Structure formats: structure tokens, C-alpha cells
Regions:
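Non-catalytic interaction/Regulatory regions outside core domains
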Residues: 1-150
Length: 150
């Protein structure tokens, strides 16, 4: 199972990848970085993306409900299926990923589920012209699943 550096290197092989990082959304610190930063500083990017991730992870608006596909109820969607048809794990993050589209690119934030109480996500910055958003989401999901933390 690969560690942080290997996973970020793999993320950078995606078409259009400009930068990647693993960020702790409670502290806003980058745990690892690769490639470029949209603002020229990975720590600033980490702090700014952490604010967005924290909002999505903590606001009740984004919690799974009985009305969600799969009708499982409760935060984490225990027993339901994700957008890829695979079963969701009980207690997992209520938000799988966030996508922000800008004129020049895409920012994909993928929450990482761990065996301990973590609050980390992968951030991938893609060029809008050469990046493939669907492929990036699928590959980030796979990278997040095999990432070893701790």
C-alpha cells in the first residue's frame, strides 16, 4: 500500500494534472504536495481548500438522508451505494468529493476515509483544456482507498 508521496505522484500522472496535495482540513496544513500550486504557495492553497472542505463536511445540508438514493438514512449512508454503484461504508464521510470549476481549471477535493478519526482530503488541480474530470474523480477515489496514513 502506497504512502503519501507515491499517491500524489500517481495523481500527477492524470491528464492535465497541474498540482496535487494531501490536506488536513481541521488544521489547513498540507501533509504532502506535488506539482504546482494555483497561487504559487502550497500552504496557502491548503488553507484555502481546507475551508471549503470543512464547510462541506460539517454542514448538515450535505449529510445523507432517507431521501438519498439507496434510502439508507443517517450520516455516512450505511448500507447504501455510492455514485459508482459500490456499497458505501458505515461511518464514512457524508461527502465523497467536491468539484470547483474555474475558467482555467478544475479543483477536485476527495475525502479520504481511514480506520482512525482523520480529517484529510486529496486536492487535485487540473487544467481545464487537457484534464479529464470524470477520469480524475475515478482515479482519486482509487488513490484515496489505497492511501496509507499513520
Amino acid at each position: 500500500m502506497p504512502g503519501i508521496d507515491e499517491c500524489l505522484t500517481e495523481a500527477m500522472t492524470l491528464p492535465g494534472a497541474r498540482g496535487a496535495s494531501l490536506v488536513d482540513w481541521t488544521s489547513g496544513l498540507a501533509l504532502g504536495t506535488a506539482g504546482e500550486s494555483p497561487v504559487g504557495d502550497h500552504e496557502t492553497t491548503a488553507a484555502e481548500t481546507a475551508e471549503l472542505a470543512r464547510s462541506a463536511a460539517e454542514f448538515d445540508t450535505f449529510l445523507a438522508t432517507d431521501d438519498d438514493a439507496g434510502g439508507t438514512g443517517g450520516a455516512g449512508g450505511a448500507g447504501g451505494t455510492g455514485d459508482d454503484g459500490r456499497p458505501e461504508k458505515a461511518g464514512g464521510p457524508p461527502v465523497e468529493d467536491l468539484i470547483v470549476t474555474t475558467r482555467a481549471g478544475y479543483h477536485v477535493l476527495r475525502f479520504v476515509e481511514t480506520s482512525f478519526d482523520s480529517s484529510v482530503f486529496l486536492h487535485l488541480w487540473l487544467d481545464r483544456e487537457t484534464g479529464n474530470l470524470a477520469l480524475a474523480r475515478m482515479r482519486l477515489r482509487d488513490i484515496a482507498e489505497k492511501l496509507v496514513l499513520g
